[in-house]
Amino acid sequence: MDLEYYEASAVVLEERALPALTTSTEETTAKQTSTNTDDDKTTSTSTSTSTGTSSKNTKLPSLTTKTTDGSTLTTSTGTSSTETASYTTPVMELPSAKGNPNIWSSNKPTGTVFIAVGSAAGFIFLALLVWFIINTWMSYSQAKQLKKFNNMEKQFQNPFIDDIDFSSGGGYYKADEDISTYKDTPVPTKNGGNNSFTPYKRASHSMIRLLGGSTDDGFGGGTPSSIGNTNLGSMNPLERVDAIDAANTGVRKSLYISPTMEVMNQQRRSTLFNNLNQSAVSIDTPEMMEPTRTVSPERRTYKHEKSKSSLSKLVDSTIDLTASTTLDNQKRQGRSKGHNKSSSITPSVYLDNMLEDNS
């Protein structure tokens, strides 16, 4: 039996995985023995040993091809061996943003946009609330003041103003809360008496006449015919003027003021007060006479005569009454002065006469 040794080169084709690099080596030894016993019968025995190492497990079987110098081609299937391998997994880390110009970073606190928007909305809401409160308060004040003025206007336009109870708080000054403190408080007068009228009723004659009321002093609402029942001779000139004014204008129900009547009243007052000391008596009525430089003297004289002739019928009774009263007073004063001059009694003689009368 001839033993022949063949050296064969083998190429292994196997699956590889990336990126790891796998290398493998394999050594194969083949031994063949042939024995010829007879001429007609030939027996051939071949032994093949294959050893190999691999650094990775393979899923598919490897293919081994051997080539010999002779005419015999032998193909065999090799088996792969199992080995243990260890792998290291790297840890992924994010790059730092510090000093990196390619990464944007903000130095503002978190929620800056939310804080800015909320602050702006809150400021607007607060401003609207303050404006609403101020507008409401101003409207309330104006409405209250307007209501007060409307009440005053209604009182002035009331033809029955004398029937209003001023002490009950329904008068012109309704807003005064302390009206009850001087409701019935008597006020001392010049003559020593007490005036129990309230401050609302102690108004001037001109205001009461404009409002359509009376003076509440015994002459309000009087008429020219009722003056004859009053003793004008027992009054001082100021009281007589008030009585005549109240009698002439007590029926006034409007706010219209006649300039002609005011001029007549001014002339009548000047006639009544000609014997009084002008420094001690003050007239509340403003001067209503015409200015001296407004018209020429000719026109002024013509106008005076015309007004005097047209108004003579209205004031005949009043002028006659006041003239007669003035003449009576002048006569009395003249008689008293003449009597004093004629007698000229000294104090000692006057005392002697008193003692003689008593005895």
Curated annotation (Swiss-Prot):
Residues 22-36, 43-89 have a biased composition (Low complexity). One of its GO terms (cellular component) is fungal-type vacuole. The chain crosses the membrane at residues 114-134. InterPro entries: PRM. It is found in: Vacuole membrane. Residues 319-328 have a biased composition (Polar residues). It is a single-pass membrane protein. Its main location: membrane. Residues 19-93, 289-359 are annotated as: Disordered. Keywords: Membrane, Transmembrane, Transmembrane helix, Vacuole. Belongs to the PRM5 family. PANTHER family: CHITIN SYNTHASE 3 COMPLEX PROTEIN CSI2-RELATED. This is Vacuolar membrane protein KLLA0F03465g. It comes from Kluyveromyces lactis (strain ATCC 8585 / CBS 2359 / DSM 70799 / NBRC 1267 / NRRL Y-1140 / WM37).
